[in-house]
């Protein structure tokens, strides 16, 4: 099931993610949105948005680019976005731009940012095409109210634009919220045509007609039920060590985790917590008692530590590593911890065809708990001493990459080759994304380390032997 989901993510991340210099910019009015259906899913610790849209080229010349608009506040939280034709499974080239437009908003002028979608073939004048645009954001609603009791249900307040935010005029539009059992508008407008209505587990708006471009002056504030933790990893340091001699790959992850859920309205009570656990009957709560770490299959030698020391409240079951922190993590609480495990190297390393000295390492970008967002991720892969990297490929855009050496046990020369990727705004959906590292590891380097160690040991033993043969006695 994960592989099926990952195939979708791979296509999504293969899009370009370039950023150009910021400038005041306004896309040409080449298109008209014939039908604009927007859906926002609030069921997770992050927001996902799907726009099903039919567009028409109203210019006099063929067009190959379509611009999608973002509010500046949400633009900085984009984890990734993609687009594809409705009737095809081929993803289109997509990229985020730094170009911006100043448009009127609720509080004066607001800044509009852009993503660009490029078509493989030009769209002729008066021709229509249907697209699906997907965006995921490393953000979620804020707790409303900010403080709740341990047994009370949590609600979140989310603000977004009510009408389509687009660089083009829209003929017909609708908007649907999904992912919660209850929705309620906060300060609903007087205009009844803008009001939403509940429909089962969704909240629907529209349809609206003839909406001008950049209609962002109608803000929607929605309160919805979300009785689950909001796991946010502020910093994740992920170290992965490859050993050709031991045929193992070792993982170690250091988490700085916080729960963005509602804070306790009263002080913490262990007695009340035990009562809550006994009476909740497996009902989901807004605090964390157990973290389910999703690990690669075949993982062994698990361990779980925190700043105090080894934590024994954990157990592994197949590819799941269940860890129980020393204390429940309520809203606003933090917990720093380290987990580690070992896998067979053959599950992650492949020999290139044509040479037994060229290797391809396939490293998962993330492991860890589901439904989690990551602000900063540092992924370091330690290759054997003497390895030479000649190509890397990451399905997720990284902010920085560096190559250096770092000495470890029995490193007598330069040390392990350390390849470090830095990422921002990741979500748990990319857990199966693979970083590919192609490198050379010649036989001479493979045997150099044990031979060097053997030479040092031999030299030491010979030194001891020579010292023993010397007559160190003092005589007259």
UniProtKB/Swiss-Prot annotation:
Similarity field: Belongs to the OST1 family.
Glycosylated sites: 18, 99, 217, 336, 400
Note: Present with 11900 molecules/cell in log phase SD medium.
Species the sequence originates in: Saccharomyces cerevisiae (strain ATCC 204508 / S288c)
Protein name, as recorded: Dolichyl-diphosphooligosaccharide--protein glycosyltransferase subunit 1
GO BP of this protein: dolichol-linked oligosaccharide biosynthetic process; protein N-linked glycosylation; protein N-linked glycosylation via asparagine
Keyword Cytoplasm set for record: no
Parts of the chain on the Lumenal side: 23-449
Assembly and interaction partners: Component of the oligosaccharyltransferase (OST) complex, which appears to exist in two assemblies comprising OST1, OST2, OST4, OST5, STT3, SWP1, WPB1, and either OST3 or OST6. OST assembly occurs through the formation of 3 subcomplexes. Subcomplex 1 contains OST1 and OST5, subcomplex 2 contains STT3, OST3, and OST4, and subcomplex 3 contains OST2, WBP1, and SWP1. Interacts with SEC61, SBH1 and SSS1.
Signal peptide limits: 1-22
């Amino acid at each position: 099931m994960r592989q099926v989901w990952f195939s979708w993510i791979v296509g999504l991340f293969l899009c370009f993610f370039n950023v150009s210099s910021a400038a005041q910019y306004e896309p040409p009015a080449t298109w008209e949105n014939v039908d604009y259906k927007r859906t926002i899913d609030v069921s997770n610790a992050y927001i996902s948005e799907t726009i099903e849209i039919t567009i028409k080229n109203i210019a006099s010349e063929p067009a190959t680019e379509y611009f999608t608009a973002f509010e500046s506040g949400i633009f900085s939280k984009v984890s990734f976005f993609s687009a594809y034709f409705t009737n095809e499974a081929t993803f289109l080239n997509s990229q985020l731009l730094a170009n911006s437009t100043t448009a009127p908003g609720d509080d004066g002028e607001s800044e509009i940012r852009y993503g660009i979608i490029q078509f493989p073939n030009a769209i002729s004048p008066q021709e229509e095409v249907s697209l699906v645009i997907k965006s995921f954001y490393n953000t979620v609603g804020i707790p409303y109210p900010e403080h709740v009791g341990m047994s009370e249900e949590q609600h979140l307040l989310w603000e977004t634009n009510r009408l389509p935010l687009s660089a083009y005029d829209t003929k017909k539009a609708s908007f649907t919220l999904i992912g919660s059992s209850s929705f309620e508008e906060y300060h609903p407008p007087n205009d009844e045509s803008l009001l939403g209505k509940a429909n089962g587990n969704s909240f629907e708006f529209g349809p609206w007609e003839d909406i001008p471009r950049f209609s962002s002056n109608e803000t929607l504030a929605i309160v919805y039920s979300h009785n689950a933790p909001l796991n946010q990893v502020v910093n994740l340091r992920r170290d992965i060590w490859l050993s050709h001699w031991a045929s193992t790959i070792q993982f170690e992850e250091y988490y700085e985790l916080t729960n963005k859920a509602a804070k306790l309205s009263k002080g913490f009570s262990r007695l009340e917590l035990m009562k809550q656990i006994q009476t909740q009957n497996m009902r989901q709560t807004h605090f964390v008692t157990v973290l389910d770490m999703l690990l690669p299959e075949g993982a062994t030698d698990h361990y779980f530590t925190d700043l105090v020391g080894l934590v024994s409240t954990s157990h592994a079951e197949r590819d799941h590593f269940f860890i129980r922190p020393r204390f429940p993590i309520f809203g606003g609480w933090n917990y720093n911890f380290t987990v580690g495990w070992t896998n067979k190297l053959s599950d992650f390393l492949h020999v290139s065809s044509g040479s037994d000295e060229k290797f391809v390492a396939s490293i998962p970008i993330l492991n860890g708990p589901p439904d989690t967002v990551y602000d900063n991720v540092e992924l370091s892969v330690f290759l054997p001493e003497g390895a030479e990297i000649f190509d890397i490929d990451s399905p997720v855009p990284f902010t920085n990459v560096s190559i250096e050496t770092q000495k470890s046990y029995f490193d007598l020369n330069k040390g392990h080759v350390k390849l470090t990727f830095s990422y921002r705004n990741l979500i748990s959906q990319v857990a199966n994304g693979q970083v590919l590292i192609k490198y050379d590891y010649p036989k001479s380097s493979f045997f150099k380390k044990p031979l060097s160690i053997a030479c040092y040991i031999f030299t030491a033993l010979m030194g001891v032997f020579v010292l023993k043969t010397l007559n160190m006695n003092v005589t007259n």
